[in-house]
Amino acid sequence: ANAEIARKIIDHAGLSDRIHVVLGTLGNGGQTLDHLESVCGLSAGGLDFIFIDHAKDAYLPDLRLILEKGWLHPGSIVVADNIRVPGAPEYRAYMKKQEGKLWRSKEHKTFAEYQSIIPDIVLESYYLNN
């Protein structure tokens, strides 16, 4: 249902030729990765922006798959939601360790979805490819 709503919004905005809604996970044995390459035409350096907001323990493994594919280019932006609540500690630690080497990141303080009193973090990262 969410994917269909997203497609309608994208179509209404006139961006259907530039944005693909893909159902699946990157860690499903290559099926989604293959789809992104063969159907969507994704190739080396082809991603300008990624928004990560799914299973928190998959943030880092999925980012690593994207890096292995070479889909990012210097200046690609990755935004990860809910870094603090419920949390993606491995992803956050990786970005801190790679600061100034592979990534330049900034933490944006926000609040958990539907909970305006619970602090959360959105992590914005710029790919340096150093």
Predicted regions: what they are:
Residues 56-130:
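C-terminal substrate-binding/active-site "lid" region of AdoMet-derived donor-dependent transferases
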Residues 50-53:
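Hydrophobic beta-strand segment of the Class I
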Residues 2-46, 57:
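S-adenosyl-L-methionine
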Residues 18-20, 46-48, 74-77, 103:
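Residue-level recognition of the N-termini of beta-strands and the immediately preceding loop/turn
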